[in-house]
Amino acid sequence: MSSKVIDKIMSFLGIEEEEEEIQTPQPVVSYDRRPKVVNIHTNPQIKVLISKPEKFEQVLSICNELKSKKPVIVDLQKMDKSEAQRVVDFLSGAVYALNGEITKISGYIFLVAPENFDVTGDIKEEVNALYNLN
């Protein structure tokens, strides 16, 4: 009983015995400490397709490749002049709509490139130097 009286007096004076808190162990979460390494110098392999359409209807497959962000070299030498002009007109419209670029390499050979493909320099001179086209 005396301990209860002493506890009450100590409580009244603001002096209390601290109760020990029982701490339960928390599970430890482990993280993978290995750094995530990404090679920023990887160059994606760019494939340039070569198309030699013989009919105007084949221009759609060229446009599909262009929509898939693939550059295409179009060789129109096997087509008659009016049909080749229709193909170039159609490709020019597609290139404009897709923010791409069309470049004449030589007579009836064109490079049709999507917007993610940068064409720089005088490509005609470079191709002529490589293949002796005149």
UniProtKB/Swiss-Prot annotation:
Domain of life, per lineage: Bacteria
Annotated signal peptide: none
Keyword Cell division: yes
Major localization class: cytoplasm
Entry GO terms, CC: cytoplasm
Keyword Cell cycle applies: yes
GO BP, one annotated term: division septum assembly
UniProt entry keywords in alphabetical sequence: Cell cycle, Cell division, Cytoplasm, Septation
Family listed: Belongs to the SepF family.
Function of the molecule: Cell division protein that is part of the divisome complex and is recruited early to the Z-ring. Probably stimulates Z-ring formation, perhaps through the cross-linking of FtsZ protofilaments. Its function overlaps with FtsA.
Protein name according to UniProt: Cell division protein SepF
